[in-house]
Each structure stands twice: as structure tokens, then as C-alpha cells.
A protein has these predicted regions:
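An active-site-proximal structural segment forming one wall of the substrate-binding cleft
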Residues: 61-63, 70-78, 123-135, 141, ...
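Aromatic-rich carbohydrate-binding modules that target alpha-glucans
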Residues: 526-528, 533, 586-626
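Aromatic- and acidic-residue-enriched carbohydrate-binding clefts of CAZyme catalytic domains
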Residues: 47-51, 87-126, 163-200
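Gram-positive Sec-dependent secretion signals
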Residues: 1-31
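Active-site-proximal helices and loops of the catalytic beta/alpha 8
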Residues: 31-50, 65-70, 83-106, 125-135, ...
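N-terminal carbohydrate-binding accessory modules
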Residues: 30-57, 66, 72-73, 162-183
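Low-complexity, disordered linker/stalk regions enriched in Pro/Thr/Ser/Gly
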Residues: 489-572
Length: 626
């Protein structure tokens, strides 16, 4: 399309907004070795365990790929996908609540041929692209159970398995347990052979079953995957489970790890989901000799205490699982606490907890020494396969916490509190503050261990000072401060993530943080300068199926950052809704008859029109009229 056409497609309305400060990256080289950072403008770590992970819940592989620049800019070393296997009852419905759980009831031991996540080729393409950003991809694996045919008979294998795994289906009675009870913590057998989510439990001590899993892991590694999360790991037996013991973890992890090392020369990262405890007096050490594990009680407790304003208990340094920090995966919330009811400390479900409080809890769990932290990207109004419309995962506060984690790898930690302020100090030159009772706050804290000097809050840009061992400064309106010898970087904000849109046009709102001005341009058009906030409407001169590339920059006069977004205009689809007009109202009408529909409530910032004015020609139905 011609440049003039791109410019004509924009309708611009600007409003003055005072810029707030946002930060992105550097640190005092005397405290943190700059050679440890991925590049001058990146803090990403080389190893999964040293960085922070983004749980791209339900995102398709292509969606993740499209958002890799933003993910890297937000400081995530690793992205975790949803389960890769073929899900039970796959449909094209995008309803998250009705569909997400199907990914945890697999009907195959291969990367899915059809799912909301995409194809095997899509996964490979994602991994190839992620490598360019220094981002690792880990995949969720369901190997404890297989999909059921009937929830009233949890030992019944779904007949859908026959299509994808015919040999397994023939021997399904050999490869699944005969134990009738649901999984619970009352006995070792109930833990490791009970039915999870009313699904048939796999005979994971069987060599053939282990081979199915090992081959799945190798298939993923061949695509470029760098690690795995094992769903329901607690319910798969260990070598120490007596008469129920097996060599599953040894065989599966050794085979996958050696295969990965042969192909890459690096170490494979594996962690397993263990909720609350190992059950029946079993030990975490039976798992940690082979994998890292979730410590959900620690993260759950931090979130609960933050929401209750209990700074002192939110900063309890003890890991509730008792595992070493280097073996622990922490979170502020997970997909199960958000979509389900698995929370362990005050909240069984966390969907009612504000984004603000989740970020405050994240400030504590993600700034700790040696442990790995997982940030759950709340879906917002996104459909299955789509990018989260809740963009907290890449907010300035979360991004700066992530970068702090990355920069201070190896530094000592000190957790503490002062009044309503919880903190995690690292070494002698960095500290993260979380206000458990509000947002803006002036602080005066002694005993943090920080050396005397001046520091910057890389969230708000405010100056902090340590004099005679007392830290003073002001926390900004996020309730979080990330304080070290860092600098700020200009940042452009966009109200709509990359993806597709329906309707003739879509409206975006652009903003600035820590910047004096910015620019935007569509495809090859001339950049348009803006300050404050600006609304632009795109799409009117594009046909369905065409993709619009939007480039947005921000500058503070010294530094400039940029971000690229891609929007595809979708082909209009019939809704199945028909409108009939009462013949009595048609007496005064004159042909030709047209209908014009205008709806600005379809999505935030989106306007739907069935056609340009005067609309579409109406059709005469002899029985009911036009």
C-alpha cells in the first residue's frame, strides 16, 4: 500500500499526560559483574534457573513468538507453554473457562496435531525465534494420567486416545492403574496411584509407559525446547516409595537430559508440580535429586500476607517445603490458584486479588536469592491461544523486579520489614521494597545492609539515599520500589497487544513513561510525533487478511526505545444473529433499504461496523418482511 494510504488511515486525538518514570537496566559494576548480563540492554540469564519465567497460559506458539520482543524487554529468561499434547475434546471454541482444563487431559504422547497452541512446526519456529532473543522455552508435560472417558469411571480411558495412540489404547488396561480411589494424602498408594482429576492413572513404573514419555520429551527437544514442567509430579512415584516405588524419575530425566546435552552442550531444566507437600510423610528429597519443585505454600503465604498488610510475615525467609532455594520454584499465584481452587494460604482462588497486590507479592518472591520465580500471565479477556489482555506481566514494576533478579544473581539476601514495608535486600547495593498497605509511601529504614550512597528507584525514577546505614526515599504509586545503582529508560505504552481484530477499524491508545516524546508509524509511512497520550484508529484502508505493522518509539532526549506490533484484520464472519423489522414500521420507508450497524462495545478500544455508511442492502423475506 502507498505511504499516503497509511497516513490517511489514522485518526488522531491527543491528550496531555504527565509522564511517569520507568526504568530498564544498568547496575553498579562493582557489585554485579557486567559480563553476567546478556547484553548492554538486556539482563537475561544463560540458565533457566538463574532467571525468571513467564507462564504464557494458553498462549499459542505463534502468539508467544509475536510477543518475544516485549517478553525479552520485560526481563524474562524463560517462557513456559501450556501442555503440548493433544487435548481431550478439542474444539475451536476460544472460551478459556470451558477449555483450558482439557489441555491437562491429554489423549496422546506426541506434540498435538490440533490444539489452541498450534502445531509442531509452530513450536519449532517459536524456539528458533526465541534463541535470537536469548529466551528459553519450556513446555508443560502431563505424564501422570491420561484423559478419561467418563468422570464417574475414572479408570476408563477416553476412546479418543485410539486415534492418536492405537497401540497404547489396545493395552490401556495394562498401562493404567486398577486402583479405584481418587488421589489424596492418606497413604503412599493413594498419593501415587490415585486418580487425579478423575483421570486414569498411568502405570509409570512400566518401561513402555516411560518410553512413551521419553519419546515425547525428545520430540520437544528436537523442536528446540529447553526444559519441562511436569504436571502432578507429586503423584508420580519415586525410588523411595517402598512397594510402590519405581525408577520413573531416574530413567525419564536421565534420558531427556543426556539427549538435550548431546544436542546442545547445555543442561536441561526440569521442575515438577508438588502442591502443599509430598503427601503421606513422603520427602521432597526423593524428587530434588532429579528435578526442581514448586514451593507453592511459600508464594501463597507471601501473597496472602501482602493483601492483609502483614509485612513482617510476608518476608519470612524460610521455605515452607524445606528444600534448598536452588531447588525451589516460587510464584505469587499460579494458573491453578487463578482458574481453580488450589491456593494454600488464605486464598483458595486468587482471581479476586488485585493486580497491584500480585505485583507486591512478586516483588518479594522474585527478588530472592537462588530460587526461580514463575509469573502467571492472567488471561484477562483473551481467548484460547491469544495473548493476555491483562498486561501486568510486562508492566514497569514487574519488568524492573525481573531485571533486579537477573542482575543480582549470586548476591546475598536479607529479608525484613519496617512498619508496612516489606523488603528484600541483595548484597550491599540493591533492595526491593513492597508497601503492604497502600502505594505511595516515604520510608526510613535502618539495618538493610546497603552501603551509604545515592540510589535510584528504577520503577519511579525517585532517588533514595543511605546515610549512616539508614535508607530514605519515597515509594511511588505502584507500591513497589526497585532500588539500586540503575538508570531509567524511556518506554512507550500501547493499549492493545499484537493479534487480530474484527470490524473495519480498531482504536489504540499510546502513552509514554519516562519519555519526553514518542513516534508511531504504520508500515512504511512517515513517523508521527506525539507527546503525552495519543489515540489512533487503524484499519479503515486495509482489507480482511492484511496485516498492519505499527512501530512505536519513545525517547527522553538521550535514549530511545522501540516496539513493533502487528495486527491482522480478520475476515468478517456471520454471527448467526438475525434482526427482523416489524412490517408496520416499514410503511414510511422508501427503497433501496439499507442497514447500518455501529458497535463500540465489542472490545476495549474496538469499534465494529458491518459496513461503511449507508450500510448493507436488506433482504426481503416474504413471511417476515425485510
Amino acid at each position: 500500500m502507498k505511504k499516503a494510504k497509511k497516513i490517511a488511515s489514522l485518526v488522531v486525538a491527543s491528550a496531555l499526560l504527565t509522564s511517569s518514570f520507568a526504568a530498564i537496566t544498568s547496575v553498579n559494576a562493582a557489585e554485579v559483574d557486567s559480563a553476567q548480563t546478556a547484553s548492554a540492554d538486556s539482563t537475561l540469564r544463560d540458565k533457566v534457573g538463574d532467571g525468571v519465567m513467564l507462564h504464557a497460559f494458553n498462549w499459542s506458539y505463534n502468539t508467544i513468538k509475536e510477543n518475544l520482543p516485549a517478553i525479552a524487554a520485560a526481563g524474562y529468561t524463560t517462557v513456559q507453554t501450556s501442555p503440548v499434547q493433544q487435548p481431550k475434546d478439542y474444539s475451536t471454541s476460544g472460551d478459556v473457562t470451558g477449555q483450558w482444563w482439557k489441555l491437562y487431559q491429554p489423549i496422546s504422547f506426541h506434540i498435538a496435531e490440533q490444539s489452541w497452541l498450534g502445531t509442531k512446526d509452530d513450536l519449532k519456529s517459536l524456539c528458533d525465534e526465541a534463541d535470537k532473543y536469548g529466551i528459553k522455552i519450556i513446555c508443560d508435560i502431563v505424564s501422570n494420567h491420561i484423559a478419561n472417558a467418563d468422570e464417574t469411571r475414572p479408570d476408563s480411558v477416553s476412546n479418543q486416545v485410539k486415534k492418536y495412540e492405537p497401540e497404547f489404547y489396545k493395552k490401556r488396561r495394562t498401562y493404567t492403574r486398577t486402583y479405584k480411589g481418587d488421589a489424596n494424602d492418606s497413604s503412599v498408594q493413594a498419593v501415587v496411584q490415585g486418580h487425579v482429576s478423575k483421570c486414569p492413572d498411568l502405570v509409570t513404573n512400566d518401561t513402555a509407559v516411560q518410553t512413551y514419555i521419553i519419546n515425547l520429551l525428545k520430540e520437544c527437544i528436537d523442536c528446540g525446547v529447553d526444559g519441562f514442567r511436569f504436571d502432578a509430579a507429586k503423584h508420580i512415584e519415586t525410588e523411595d516409595d517402598g512397594e510402590y516405588a519405581s525408577d520413573y524419575w531416574k530413567n525419564v530425566t536421565t534420558s531427556a537430559s543426556s539427549y538435550y546435552t548431546q544436542k546442545t552442550g547445555d543442561d536441561l531444566y526440569i521442575y515438577g508440580e508438588i502442591l502443599n507437600n509430598c503427601g503421606a510423610d513422603r520427602s521432597y528429597s526423593s524428587y530434588t535429586k532429579y528435578i526442581n519443585v514448586t514451593d507453592n505454600r511459600t508464594g501463597d503465604a507471601v501473597l496472602y500476607n501482602v493483601t492483609r498488610g502483614k509485612a513482617s510475615t510476608a518476608t519470612n525467609a524460610k521455605y515452607k517445603s524445606g528444600v534448598a532455594a536452588s531447588n525451589a520454584v516460587l510464584w505469587a499465584e499460579s494458573h491453578d490458584t487463578y482458574e481453580g481452587n488450589s491456593g494454600s494460604s488464605g486464598y483458595s482462588n486468587t482471581s479476586s486479588v488485585s493486580d497491584e497486590d500480585v505485583v507486591k507479592a512478586w516483588a518479594i518472591v522474585a527478588s530472592r536469592k537462588d530460587s526461580t520465580a514463575l509469573f502467571f500471565a492472567r488471561p484477562g479477556t483473551a481467548l484460547m491461544g491469544g495473548v493476555s489482555t491483562d498486561t501486568t506481566y510486562k508492566s514497569t514494576a514487574v519488568s524492573e523486579i525481573n531485571k533486579f533478579h537477573n542482575l543480582f544473581v549470586g548476591q546475598s539476601e536479607k529479608l525484613g520489614s519496617s512498619g508496612d514495608i516489606a523488603y528484600v535486600a541483595r548484597g550491599t547495593s540493591g533492595i526491593v521494597l513492597s508497601n503492604c498497605k497502600g502505594t505511595n509511601a516515604s520510608v526510613s529504614i535502618s539495618g538493610t545492609g546497603l552501603a551509604d550512597g545515592k540510589y535510584t528507584d528504577t520503577v519511579s525514577g525517585a532517588e533514595f539515599t543511605v546515610a549512616n546505614g539508614v535508607l530514605t526515599g519515597s515509594i511511588g504509586n505502584t507500591g513497589v520500589a526497585v532500588v539500586y545503582n540503575g538508570t531509567t529508560t524511556p518506554k512507550a505504552i500501547n493499549s492493545v497487544e499484537s493479534g487480530s481484530f474484527r470490524g473495519d477499524t480498531m482504536t489504540l491508545t499510546l502513552g509514554l513513561e519516562n519519555a519526553t516524546s514518542g513516534t508511531y508509524c504504520l508500515d512504511d509511512s512517515t513517523p508521527v510525533k506525539f507527546t503525552g497520550t495519543t489515540s489512533i484508529r487503524i484499519g479503515s484502508d486495509y482489507k480482511p487478511g492484511e496485516t498492519i505493522t505499527l512501530t512505536v518509539t519513545a525517547t527522553d532526549g538521550v535514549k530511545t526505545s522501540s516496539m513493533v506490533y502487528k495486527y491482522t484484520k480478520s475476515t468478517a464472519q456471520e454471527s448467526g444473529v438475525y434482526v427482523f423489522f416489524n412490517p408496520a414500521t416499514q410503511k414510511g420507508w422508501s427503497a433501496p433499504y439499507q442497514v447500518y450497524i455501529y458497535d463500540e462495545t465489542t472490545n476495549k478500544g474496538t469499534v465494529y461496523k458491518n459496513a461503511n455508511w449507508p450500510g448493507e442492502a436488506m433482504t426481503l423475506d416474504p413471511a417476515t418482511g425485510y
